[in-house]
UniProtKB/Swiss-Prot annotation:
GO terms for cellular component: cytosolic large ribosomal subunit. PROSITE patterns: RIBOSOMAL_L13. Part of the 50S ribosomal subunit. Transmembrane segments: none annotated. One of its GO terms (molecular function) is mRNA binding. SUPFAM superfamilies: Ribosomal protein L13. GO terms for biological process: negative regulation of translation; translation. This protein is one of the early assembly proteins of the 50S ribosomal subunit, although it is not seen to bind rRNA by itself. It is important during the early stages of 50S assembly. The lineage of its organism: Bacteria, Pseudomonadati, Pseudomonadota, Gammaproteobacteria, Thiotrichales. The keyword Ion transport does not apply. This is Large ribosomal subunit protein uL13.
Length: 142
């Protein structure tokens, strides 16, 4: 039996619309990462981008369990000496609601050029409105 490899011409990409209202952050992120990688398709090939486009709306209404809304902290470094910066989940959602979902999904994708290509297919919006109506995204339930 031969190993199956998807051909770029045979890869069919869909646009999926996911509503993040009252969804748990980590559980939503794992599902989205699987869709972006294409692992939900029978023609999944590890060295190719076979995933679909994902549009997430209502990112500001994402849920976290326990005390994480106040206690969860995101860190980044500016590159300067002593340049470590931190922001709580609560402040991040208040200022840039889409970044919490983007960071969670990005951490679940490969840290390679292929992973960066997969991440570009993720579109996250704070509210209900999104500019991808022309692509006719299908509602996807998680």
């Amino acid at each position: 039996m031969k190993t199956f490899t998807a051909k770029p011409s045979n890869i069919k990409r869909e646009w999926l619309l996911i509503d993040a209202t009252d969804k748990t952050l980590g559980r939503l992120a794992t599902e989205v990462a699987m869709i972006l990688r294409g692992k939900n398709k029978p023609e999944y090939t590890p060295h190719m981008d076979t995933g679909d486009y994902v549009v997430i709306v209502n990112a500001e209404k994402i849920a976290v369990t326990g005390n994480k809304r106040k206690a969860k902290t995101y860190y980044h470094h500016t590159g300067y000496i002593g340049g470590i910066k931190s922001v709580s989940f609560e402040k991040l959602i208040a200022t840039h609601p889409e970044r919490a979902i983007e960071k969670a999904v990005r951490g679940m994708l490969p840290r390679t050029p292929l992973g960066r290509t997969m991440f570009k297919k993720l579109k996250v919006y704070a509210g209900e409105a999104h500019p991808h109506t022309a692509q006719q995204p299908k509602a996807h339930n998680i």
